[in-house]
């Protein structure tokens, strides 16, 4: 398919670029998440043959990150012992996540990205992904959106949610945040302090 062909070319180019300065660069694989068997196959090739160090995908996963259809993908990441980096997808309609309210004032970047990242964190933790795959390493872009700021509210509601994961119910959402990784590309000390309060970043 087009997606698979693109990822094959992207990953080869990524490996070629890393090879120019392997002591300074590492590369992450792009994966055709529209077709999970192909994504798993390309992940194995990218890591085992091309020497890439993990994978990077967007938040535009229609079934959500907690869907058990993704479990073979998570297991493949664990088997290969490589991390997954999740970056916010655009909310301007390019990836199908169109929200016209975000068209003004760069809201797609300031609010849309944060919304996508927060949803990803919440789905992963409340949906029990790390209960099912405790050795899985996932890093979320931009400090995980607003997850650290909203941790107590999410935890409060999780305690009365019969579908919330056992990990969150037993340990609390804030504690479970420590099972994820976050980059520190956040703006300002207030955001950085909230992130440091809960998570290793």
Stretches with model-predicted labels:
Residues 1-123, 127-128:
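Active-site gating/metal-coordination segments in enzymes
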